Amino acid sequence: MRLTVVGANGKMGRELITAIQRREDVELCAVLVRKGSPFVDKDASILTGSDFLNIRITDDPENAFSNTEGILDFSQPQASILYANYAAQKSLVHIIGTTGFSKTEEEKIADFAKDTTIVKSGNMSLGVNLLASLVKKAAKALEVDDFDIEIYEMHHSGKVDAPSGTALLLGQAAAEGRNVMLKNVSVNARNGYTGEREKGTIGFACSRGGTVVGDHSITFAGPNERIVLSHVAQDRSIFANGALKAALWAKNHENGLYSMLDVLGLKDEF
């Protein structure tokens, strides 16, 4: 499968290029960076320190998408909307690992998915998606009046959105387990005099620092006991490999908006 990596000079872009080179069932077709990037017209190998790849880095989407079958996208929300439009027009598979979308942007992506196959997830790893399944089951089983839910995440100092897409994915799982809307029960910050914790809310706490790839934990705090579920990402390759798995899966599926739960066969479990 021929693939284009967008946002290629970012951490995940570089990881995706490396992951593609290690496999025989996918091929790096093009590499796209932002307009005016100093990497334009250089060989893609400069991004990974690998041997010469004979793929010229471009900042022109038309050029990058002219001979590809799929787009691997861990960029920024505004850019992802642009790429989703291209994907819909050209019937290209679009794998979206970008996070931080607004409600309006989410609606646009859903609309574009009518004309192409999109897999969108706040986290592409098997472990996190299994964790989400467990979180939903736990939230459903534990009484709201007895157990409070708190989600904690930590990422590297360069991450620009909070809570992370993964934290929100886990929060959504917990909310679905309790049959409520996350937006109605989430508490994203506590500061100063907050009063007592409101029953049924789902709290989020975020930290940024160092080179942390991604730590997430979900605590169900009840009377005299706590249940803690967690996931630690040690290397970004787990996200890259998940994205490639999603692309190959999407190639053989009808137009629509899917998640990694679909790709991993966890939808029914979830």
From Swiss-Prot:
Subcellular location: Cytoplasm
Pfam families: DapB_C (PF05173), DapB_N (PF01113)
Keywords tagged on the record: Amino-acid biosynthesis, Cytoplasm, Diaminopimelate biosynthesis, Lysine biosynthesis, NAD, NADP, Oxidoreductase
Keyword hit for Amino-acid biosynthesis: yes
Chief subcellular location: cytoplasm
Domain of life: Bacteria
Keyword Transcription: no
Residues reported in the UniProt entry to bind NADP(+): 34
Protein name: 4-hydroxy-tetrahydrodipicolinate reductase
